[in-house]
Every structure is written in C-alpha cells, then in structure tokens.
Amino acid sequence: VFIETLGNPNSDVVDIEKIANIAHAHKIPLVIDNTFATPYLVRPIEYGADIVVHSATKFIGGHGTTIGGVIVDSGKFDWEASGKFASLVEPNPSYHGVSFTKAVGPAAFVTKIRAILLRDTGATISPFHAFIFLQGLETLSLRVERHVQNALKVVEYLNNHPQVENVNHPSVSKDPEQQALYKKYFPNGGGSIFTFEIKGDAQKAKD
C-alpha cells in the first residue's frame, strides 16, 4: 500500500494508523511518501508505516541544487511471514543464491535495494551531492517551521479574499474528518503546499 502523508496537490491528510492496520491485517507493508511533510512535521514510522520515502530534492536539500531520494526501512515488517514477497524469501541466483529474509530478517527489503538494485542501476548519489543534502538537513527544522508560518499567512489571506472560491490546505479544511486528522498528525502545522480555486471561469481569472 502506497500513500502520501500530505496528498499532492491539495495536501489532504491521511489516517496513517488506520491504513497501517488495514495493510498489516492483510500482511502487506505500508509505504509512505513523506516529501511534503518532512520528518519535522510527522514521522510515519511512529504511526505504523513500514517504509518511508522522500524526494530529497525538495525540503531536505532545500535549495534545488541536487536530485536525490531517500528510503527509510523501519525494519519491522516480517517479509517472510507475509508470504507475498518471493523475491525476498527465495534464493536469489544473481547474488550467490542468498535468501534475503534468511540472511538479514526484517532488513531484507533495504538489503536487497543495496545489493541488487544499487548494483544493477547505479542509483546512488555522489559524495558531493550527499554533502549538500546533509547541509540541508542541518537547517531542515528551522526552514520547515518558517515555511509553515509563511504558508499560513498566505492561506489566511486567500481564504478571506472575495475572489477566491476555496483554499485547499489542512489548516482551513471544512471537513470534520480532515480537521481531526490534522490535529492528530500535524501539531507543528500542515506543511506549506496548498492550492486554491478562484471564483468564475478561466476568462474571469485572466481578467
């Protein structure tokens, strides 16, 4: 099961715990894209996610200088007991016949990524680009905090503008369920990505 902590583009909030419970009841891992929220706003593994991914190019890097991504494996999902992931359980002929679940247990998924996908595709970043991302991480919490503060001011302005029909951001959602999920998962703010709809048609927007 693959979801986003904040849906693109309207920043819809998902109930991570509920979806995690449903996935685990069917012996399926929950994978979450946490790019919009970042670890500063929400840490999905604490709510039951098994794997978290980020586009590091966005908030982690912070300056649009580097392309990269992050995969975080919680190490909590039992891939062998699931019975749905033969490529992790059965011997891999391209890697000396190793069974990743037998060799490293719950770390089978991330180990296969390193041993097979990295080997086959070369999906890794250079030392310099890694350095740039690490520099970005040093200021991540402060930057995201400011992003949220600035976004809330713009959202408030647009939400009260007579020519704006609707603003899509969890802080101003009129949906009771979204309001509850926002309070539960985002005590530090609902991110800085939002969309809005203007009143009238395309021509009126141009006018």
What are these regions (language model features)?
Residues 121-124, 130, 139, 151-207:
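Conserved small-domain helix->loop->beta segment predominantly found in fold-type I
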